[in-house]
């Protein structure tokens, strides 16, 4: 009986530590949820800062934070960024040039670039 229990425990430990599709899928979902939270946090900070010219910085920072979580976070950042730009492109009337610049900042952050490249002068250090 003890040998059987030991065997079952060993089997559970081996299966739990294995790189299986369920573990990877679960990690992807958790990364995506965390990435969505990172994007929301960057949006809230942008609204709170209310600083002229800071939108590109917050775009890059949200994508950067989300992508650092892993493939799920990078996927969430890409989906959210693309959806936001597609929606804003038709509603805000800011133009194609601004949308292109936003997408450049999104890609910069998502690819691991330092968001401070887009940091405007005078933005409080808390951001």
From Swiss-Prot:
Record flagged with keyword Signal: yes
Disease: Reactive, secondary amyloidosis is characterized by the extracellular accumulation in various tissues of the SAA protein. These deposits are highly insoluble and resistant to proteolysis; they disrupt tissue structure and compromise function.
GO terms for cellular component: high-density lipoprotein particle
Secretion signal, residue range per the UniProt entry: 1-18
Functional summary from the UniProt entry: Major acute phase reactant. Apolipoprotein of the HDL complex.
Any matching Pfam family: SAA
GO biological process: acute-phase response
Keywords: Acute phase, Amyloid, HDL, Secreted, Signal
Location within or outside the cell: Secreted
Protein source organism: Anas platyrhynchos
Post-translational modification: This protein is the precursor of amyloid protein A, which is formed by the removal of approximately 3 residues from the C-terminal end.
Induction comment: Upon cytokine stimulation.
Keyword Chloroplast among record annotations: no
The name this protein goes by in its record: Serum amyloid A protein
Origin: domain of life: Eukaryota
Main location group: secreted
Protein family per UniProt: Belongs to the SAA family.
Tissue expression notes: Expressed by the liver; secreted in plasma. Also present in the liver and lung irrespective of induction.
Chain segments carrying region Disordered: 88-127
InterPro entries recorded: Serum_amyloid_A, Synovial_Prolif_Regulator
